[in-house]
Structures are given as C-alpha cells and as structure tokens.
C-alpha cells in the first residue's frame, strides 16, 4: 500500500433548519399568538484520531465530506430535529490546516482526539421569538444558518519513536526488515523506498518501539530537491535518529562526506533536529573494505570540531546480523530518556503557561461594485450573504427586517456614497432589489 501523506479536501457542514411562521389555533384560547418553532441545528464535520489508520489513502478517493441539514421547525413551538454530526477518522499524527489561509488548525496526536473542522449552522428562529408589545403577531421567521464550508489540507507526519535516515541505498530498508515485522521493498538501486515504512521492534527484555524507514535523502533536500520536504517532515517527529552510513565504498563515495551532507540538510531544514539523541550506524560491515573505511570515518568524526555533538557509533551488518542486537538495545536505552520533540508535544489539561488573546472589534466588511454592462450594483460580503440566506424572502416582514439590518451595517450610506440613486437595481447573491434610500 502506498503511503499517502498529503491530501486536500472540502468539508461542508449542514445548514440549520428553517424556523416557521405559525399561530396558535385552539378552542377557548383567544388571540393564541405566534407558535412557530425553531429549526434544528445542522450537523458539524468532526475529525477524530483513529490509531488503527496509517495513511491518508482514504482521502485520495473521497475528497468531499458533507453533513446533513437540521430539520425545519414545526407548529406548536416544536423545534426541528438537529442533524447528527459526521465523524471523519484520521490517522494519528495528522496536521490539519486551512488550505485557503495556511492557518494550522490542529495537530492530531492523541488517539480519540476530536476537532470540529466545519461547524453546522444554527437553526433559524420561528416567529414565537419575534413577538413584541408593538407586534404581538409577527409574521417573521429565520431560515437556518448556512453550514461552514472549508478547504482543508491534511498532512501526515510519521509518528515513530525511531527514524532511519541516510543516503539512498545506505541499508535502511534492510535493517528495518531484519529487526521488525515490516516488509519494505529492498533492491540494489537508489530510491527503492519512496514512502515511509513502519515496523514494530520488540527486544528480548520485552521493550518495544516503532521504527520508520524514511525515504533516502540527497543533497539539496532542505530546498525541496529529490524527495526533499516529503522526507524531512517525517524526521520532525522522531525521538531518536539512527543515521545509517554505507561503509562499503563500492560506488566510490566517501562515507564521511555523505554523513556531513545529511547533517547539513537536517540543520538547514530545522537545526533543533540535531539536538535529538542520535546514533551513527556504519552499515555493510561484511564488505571487504568496510573495516578500513570505518577506521578512517571514526578518526574524521573525532577530529571534526564542527559537529553539534560527538555521536555514538555502532557498526552493523544487516546481512550477518553482527552488531544489530547491540544497536537495538542502545536505541531502547536512549528512547527511555528521550523527550518528545518540543514542537509536537500535545498540550496538557493542567497546562498553566500564560496565554494571550486579542480582542477583535466587530466589523461589517462588504463591497459595493457597479456592473456597467448589467446596469446594476453588486453588493457582496460574507456577513451580508449569510444574512440574506437566513432571510425568508417569501414574506414581506422578513424582507423589511433584512433591509433594516443592511441599513444598520451602513449599506445604504455606502451605496449612496458610491453614486447609487433611488430606483437602481442592487444584486445580492443572485437576487435583485430596488434601492430606496431612507434618511
């Protein structure tokens, strides 16, 4: 199965049910008054973490998620049925962002964690809510509020305890297949691994951890070259890094040069990655020149003052299994004390860190535009369009209420400033109205 780690989808919450206009008609109840009920709430779209999922494959074939609308209100003040929320399961480790603004909405880390990504519209109010001493029998009601619509970007970063990094053909897939139940593709050519493979490693002392074989890295990856960012985003979440370096030299490559290039790419992408526990793993020690190359490599590491830390070096041969058990034990020891990556620690309920909030005063953003070829004004804006959709245009009373709401928002003044005259056509959301300015 391919590892799909990015997807873009659309979510559409359910519209609220419409409120209705109704009056109480009962024997012996004089002037019963308004009795129209409210609409039910529309269903929301909720993401929920399911630790059993491993990829975003499902979102490749289903990119549109829609919740049901709420039921309309009834007579006798009865409220319409609220729609069920639609729960969409996502893998553990999914980052959810708004595709239009780039805002990160949440990092879905904990099994069972939920996030409302599109809120269902509230039900419209029935005429029972609009009675006043001046108007005891109102013919006013609201349509349901539109459900929220969002374009979302999903990005899955591997949640593994240990990440295997290194140049292509360094032996990452072979090591994973030896120490775990994973069956990655292994072949004698570069970039055999194009997507992460994950395996569970279990030691003789019952310690276990999750290991990920990440796609091979090349120079320039921090600028997106090769598999670039697709590789590096997964490294961010690993607690311990095993840096595999090919000691065979069969392709004329210098092990230490390759090692430094990988470090440079990690540092350019995110320098904090280099502060994590790391083991350098010289591989293919069963090859003829490997011992000589290892001795030279150790000397170069020891004399390099530019290294962030002097790493542990554990040579292995995945073919003969030499050194593999020692490597896994040392890895488990490091994991026991390794902290979670700082940027991905889930916030705890007892978090007492100071938070700041910004007050945003209410604004009425809308635009007025003259469409010359149609000889009409175009009035647009999210708030205006929402108010219009919640207006029952079949009833004069609700249209008059909508006109008052627009006047309160400053629409009349804005139209007059733009040059609108009495009798001009004004279009709102594909419906036309006649402009009449009121002082």
UniProtKB/Swiss-Prot annotation:
Q: Which GO terms describe its biological process?
A: ribosome biogenesis
What region holds the OBG-type G domain? 160-336
Which PROSITE patterns does this chain map to? G_OBG, GTP1_OBG, OBG, OCT
Basic and acidic residues bias: where? 344-354
**EC number from the UniProt entry:** 3.6.5.-
GO MF terms here are: GTP binding; GTPase activity; magnesium ion binding
Names of the cofactor(s): Mg(2+)
Name the keywords, alphabetized. Answer: Cytoplasm, GTP-binding, Hydrolase, Magnesium, Metal-binding, Nucleotide-binding
- One Gene Ontology cellular component annotation held by this UniProt entry: cytoplasm
Q: By its UniProt entry, which Gene3D superfamilies does this protein fall under? A: GTP-binding protein OBG, C-terminal domain (3.30.300.350), GTP1/OBG domain (2.70.210.12), P-loop containing nucleotide triphosphate hydrolases (3.40.50.300)
Q: Where does Mg(2+) bind?
A: 173, 193
Could you say which protein family the record assigns here? Answer: Belongs to the TRAFAC class OBG-HflX-like GTPase superfamily. OBG GTPase family.
What HAMAP family has UniProt attached to this entry? GTPase_Obg
Protein name from the UniProt record: GTPase Obg
What is the native source organism of this protein?
A: Leuconostoc mesenteroides subsp. mesenteroides (strain ATCC 8293 / DSM 20343 / BCRC 11652 / CCM 1803 / JCM 6124 / NCDO 523 / NBRC 100496 / NCIMB 8023 / NCTC 12954 / NRRL B-1118 / 37Y)
